[in-house]
Amino acid sequence: MAGPFSRLLSARPGLRLLALAGAGSLAAGFLLRSEPVRAASERRRLYPPSAEYPDLRKHNNCMASHLTPAVYARLCDKTTPTGWTLDQCIQTGVDNPGHPFIKTVGMVAGDEETYEVFAELFDPVIQERHNGYDPRTMKHTTDLDASKIRSGYFDERYVLSSRVRTGRSIRGLSLPPACTRAERREVERVVVDALSGLKGDLAGRYYRLSEMTEAEQQQLIDDHFLFDKPVSPLLTAAGMARDWPDARGIWHNNEKSFLIWVNEEDHTRVISMEKGGNMKKVFERFCRGLKEVERLIQERGWEFMWNERLGYILTCPSNLGTGLRAGVHIKLPLLSKDSRFPKILENLRLQKRGTGGVDTAATGSVFDISNLDRLGKSEVELVQLVIDGVNFLIDCERRLERGQDIRIPPPLPNKH
């Protein structure tokens, strides 16, 4: 059970718990009174904002599109209650201009309050990235009722594996770009303690990266079970690779079909996956496991970061809302060579990656296809969108195999 300091963390606004974790347990707690979220503190600087404004002229990311000198001047001296600044939010986007044809987000949050204190920049970035969702006027819905899914069984001549993942953050502890070693270890302690309560087909064990051999880590990475080593410039520039591999690890059930990553880009990534095309079964396990993990977290006096405007709070604005990415590894040797392929994906609100994850190339015409949106639609809606979209892609591939023409579908209606 969480101690009195831990429970105060999420129970009393305006109080901040600084947990000093040692040997995997809470060693001491100090209550630090902070100002309300919107009354962010100010800090002094030696030079005017105009002298500090970053050179974004060659950048192609959402942050650069919305960070004007005026916005920078209004926000650059603010800090969240934990001391997180605007410059820390945007550093990864400043250091990584982006690809001419691939627009990245270009910013991260350091804590839950980041999205309020720097809302003048985050809100328009969120609106652009999430297909017009306006966090100032809209509310996000959550739906984890897997029984609502229609169909969900793919032709396994094309679909090699199915997977659904999300992220969850522990309220009261800084997010990975900003967390201290003690906070990161506290995240690990809280999560692993909760996961020990999983039963039945969800029961499993936790494996610390620091206790694995290089060969064991690489095998898990190659099998698509474990996150890659922190070599991505987006990850390192944001500060998420500090102290690697301290307090990082993977928990999985005995069948390796339900997994939780700890302390990579987010506090946790919850994953349901299996070989083949049974997306409905994968999503059912995902919903059941995620609900049970949240119950066990709450039972111990903690809770996930969430609000009705943004849904579940995660490090990258692209993952707000559901945090959900439902995807398949799919063979599309003919469609992938068709010039209409990118437009088809765009209209279906799908995105493609290589099978090694973000920023990787496809191998053998096998792609990772998943939903583009996270916020403004429920989990059920997004998984159904992927099911319908992947079936459309399979139909296109079959038509091309028979020498028939394919069509570009009309854009999906934008319903938030």
From Swiss-Prot:
User: What's its top-level EC category?
Assistant: transferase
Which residues are listed for ATP binding in this entry? Answer: 161-165, 224, 269, 325, 353-358, 368
Presequence extent in this chain: 1-39
Which keywords accompany this UniProt record? Answer: ATP-binding, Kinase, Membrane, Mitochondrion, Mitochondrion inner membrane, Nucleotide-binding, Phosphoprotein, Transferase, Transit peptide
A single GO CC term for this protein reads: mitochondrial inner membrane
Keyword Membrane recorded: yes
All residue ranges annotated as the Phosphagen kinase N-terminal domain in the record = 45-131
Entry's Gene Ontology BP terms: negative regulation of apoptotic process; phosphocreatine biosynthetic process
Where Phosphoserine occurs, the residues are: 151, 196, 232, 365
Q: Where is this protein found?
A: Mitochondrion inner membrane
Mode of membrane association:
Peripheral membrane protein
- Identify the stretch(es) annotated as Cardiolipin-binding: 40-64
Phosphothreonine is carried by which residues? 213, 355
> What Enzyme Commission number(s) apply to this enzyme?
2.7.3.2
Q: Does the keyword Mitochondrion apply?
A: yes
Outline the extent of the Phosphagen kinase C-terminal domain.
Answer: 158-400
Which reaction equations make up its catalytic activity? Answer: creatine + ATP = N-phosphocreatine + ADP + H(+)
Pfam families reported for this sequence: ATP-gua_Ptrans, ATP-gua_PtransN
Show the PROSITE patterns listed in the entry: PHOSPHAGEN_KINASE, PHOSPHAGEN_KINASE_C, PHOSPHAGEN_KINASE_N
Q: What CDD domains does the record point to? A: creatine_kinase_like
Which molecular function GO terms apply here?
A: ATP binding; creatine kinase activity
What does this protein do, in the record's words? Reversibly catalyzes the transfer of phosphate between ATP and various phosphogens (e.g. creatine phosphate). Creatine kinase isoenzymes play a central role in energy transduction in tissues with large, fluctuating energy demands, such as skeletal muscle, heart, brain and spermatozoa.
Q: Subunit details for this protein?
A: Exists as an octamer composed of four MTCK homodimers.
What additional remark is attached to this entry? Mitochondrial creatine kinase binds cardiolipin.
Query: Mind telling me which PANTHER family this protein's record contains?
Result: ARGININE OR CREATINE KINASE, CREATINE KINASE U-TYPE, MITOCHONDRIAL
Name of the protein in its database record: Creatine kinase U-type, mitochondrial
Which species? Answer: Bos taurus (Bovine)
Organismal lineage: Eukaryota, Metazoa, Chordata, Craniata, Vertebrata
